[in-house]
Amino acid sequence: MAHSWVEIDLAALRHNYSRAKERLAPGSRILGVVKSDAYGHGMIPVARELVACGASFLAVSKHWEAVDLRAAGIRLPILCLLGVEPSEMAEAIRNEIRPVIYRIDHARRLSDTARSLNATATVHVKLDTGMGRLGIPCRHLEAFLNELLTLPAIRLEGVLSHFASADEADKTSSTLQLTRFREAMALLSARGLSVLGHIANSAGLLDLPQAHFDLARPGIMLYGSPPSLELHKPADLRPVMTFKSKIIQLKDVQAGQPIGYGGTFVTAAPGRIATIPVGYDDGYPRLLSNRGRVLVRGMSAPVVGRVSMNMITADVTHIPSAREDDEVVLLGAQGTERVTAEEIAQLCGTISYEIYCSIGRNRFKSFHNGIANSN
């Protein structure tokens, strides 16, 4: 039996997909984002579920993720958001992976590689409409197209960009990005090019229906978290991930007992301390030392002392029914209580995305359809 494990609720994933689909503007389709092991939720099982739900495309960040999806039998069009390196191009073409292109030298190499394979490489061009990160500046798009369209083994299927702050209440920046993206799409249309346009992430899908174009790219909302708490039109989402462990020891302690490294917590009165075999090695943030909480027998118990590499301690004095080997929920629901990724993220000064990715590295992961497996 594992000391800790992650449970993934595929029924919740399907529910969240349906909420995304309900928000789609007419004519738009879903491109499901499964990069970074589906935000820690398990890329291949999640991808299979999204295929069954009717997604039209999938997106990953890295080439090897796309190759793994193909090896798992996923035939849906797959977009590689970071593009592919020259050493990966032949494999990408053979696997019909769609690289995102933002460098003309890579486009040339890709075309040459495709010609050598007697094939065509299908690509999407990335525009920087204001995020300042990855992509061709809009003012350079026409010159980029002038060369790209001369490459004999390249098929331009799509153009994409990415919102920098669609998850904020103030949509000024997003509106400017949207204007620039529309202008780019108009330029393509004027040249007789019919391509797929996509810019909407989860926040764009929820709050900016005018940004849906041909595809929308939900990511975090598929996994049950809102992109932020500032959205004008939040959705009814269900968390997909639960993180569990168990009590491996219960200890009665006297007043004045230091707990954990450095004795940063000292008991003020006699009580009971539960030791739980989870630590920062398992993705449980050290920043939750003396700040976090876990669920035991449907009740909240504060984390006391420092989070160490493989263990934490919780004060269960107020839960007299607690027993050794009892299930502990570190993320998710137990009874009527719930610890959310947003709560953990706020305590750690980060975002839910990072919490999911960290916890999702746990090697013991099970998948269920609304009724969790026993461990």
UniProtKB/Swiss-Prot annotation:
InterPro entries the record matches: Ala_racemase, Ala_racemase/Decarboxylase_C, Ala_racemase_C, Ala_racemase_N, Ala_racemase_pyridoxalP-BS, PLP-binding_barrel
GO annotation (BP), single: D-alanine biosynthetic process
Binding-site residues for substrate, renumbered to this chain: 133, 309
Reactions listed under catalytic activity: L-alanine = D-alanine
EC annotation from Swiss-Prot or TrEMBL: 5.1.1.1
GO CC terms, sorted: cytosol
Record keywords, A-Z: Isomerase, Pyridoxal phosphate
Cofactor(s) demanded: pyridoxal 5'-phosphate
GO MF assignments: alanine racemase activity; pyridoxal phosphate binding
Domain of life, per lineage: Bacteria
Sequence positions bearing N6-(pyridoxal phosphate)lysine: 35
Pathway note: Amino-acid biosynthesis; D-alanine biosynthesis; D-alanine from L-alanine: step 1/1
Function (record text): Catalyzes the interconversion of L-alanine and D-alanine. May also act on other amino acids.
Protein name, as recorded: Alanine racemase
Naturally occurring in which organism (per UniProt): Syntrophobacter fumaroxidans (strain DSM 10017 / MPOB)
